[in-house]
């Protein structure tokens, strides 16, 4: 499961303990007996977009996303954005990391800046997902939840970056609260089964990754990784 909220969390469940502490992957006992869960966590996901909307664009997020949807931005010419507005956890574990725009020019449009924020968050989530996968856990199905998941554009971009199908389900924007409520019901009803209390919500949309779009994104992803590595000692 991928949560695109204020922070960004890639969450997976295992029936045994797995870990990758070198890359700041969290490993915990699950609330459900006999299970473990792993998380990769980035500290500024959808909050990066909100920061940009409030402090740079001075425009509501919804209007910026509508503008981007209609703008046909050339992603290969957009700036790169490092979304480390609150430092970063997985995979860098660096509280001193900072946000960066790289590659601004006179031709950079507002829509290109909006795109760069979505892309930068997506790249950071991809790095976190890779760190979790390095623990040996490889989820087959990824459901997308959180407020940022309301954007079909962002959902598709994430599918392209991760190169995995992403499912967005009914009430996905409030997924964490729904999950907490279901755990509470299980706790006070010990005879209830997981299937009874936790049915899969209806599917709203599924986003298939595009190999063609990934071919354009892959070099930018490598530059994104290299940019942090070159700047890390300067933060």
What is the predicted function of each stretch?
Residues 1-145, 150-235:
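Active-site core segments that coordinate phosphate-bearing ligands/cofactors
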């Amino acid at each position: 499961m991928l949560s695109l909220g204020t922070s960004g969390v890639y969450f997976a469940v295992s029936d045994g303990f797995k870990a990758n502490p070198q890359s700041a992957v969290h490993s915990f006992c699950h609330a459900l007996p006999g299970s473990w869960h792993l998380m990769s966590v980035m500290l500024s996901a959808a909050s990066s977009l909100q920061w940009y909307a409030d402090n740079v664009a001075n425009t509501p997020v919804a209007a910026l996303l509508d503008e981007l949807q209609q703008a046909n931005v050339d992603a290969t010419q957009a700036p790169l954005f490092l979304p480390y507005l609150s430092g970063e956890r997985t995979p860098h574990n660096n509280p001193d990391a900072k946000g960066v725009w790289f590659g601004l020019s006179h031709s950079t449009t507002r829509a290109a800046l909006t795109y760069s924020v979505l892309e930068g968050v997506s790249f950071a989530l991809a790095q976190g997902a890779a760190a979790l996968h390095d623990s040996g856990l490889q989820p087959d199905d990824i459901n997308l939840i959180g407020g940022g998941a309301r954007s079909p554009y962002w959902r598709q971009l994430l599918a392209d970056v991760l190169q995995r199908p992403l499912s967005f389900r009914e009430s996905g924007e409030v997924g964490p609260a729904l999950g907490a409520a279901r755990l509470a019901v299980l706790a006070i009803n010990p005879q209830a089964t997981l299937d009874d209390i936790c049915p899969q919500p209806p599917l709203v949309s599924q986003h298939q990754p595009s190999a063609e779009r990934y071919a354009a994104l892959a070099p930018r992803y490598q530059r994104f990784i290299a940019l942090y590595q070159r700047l890390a000692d300067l933060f």
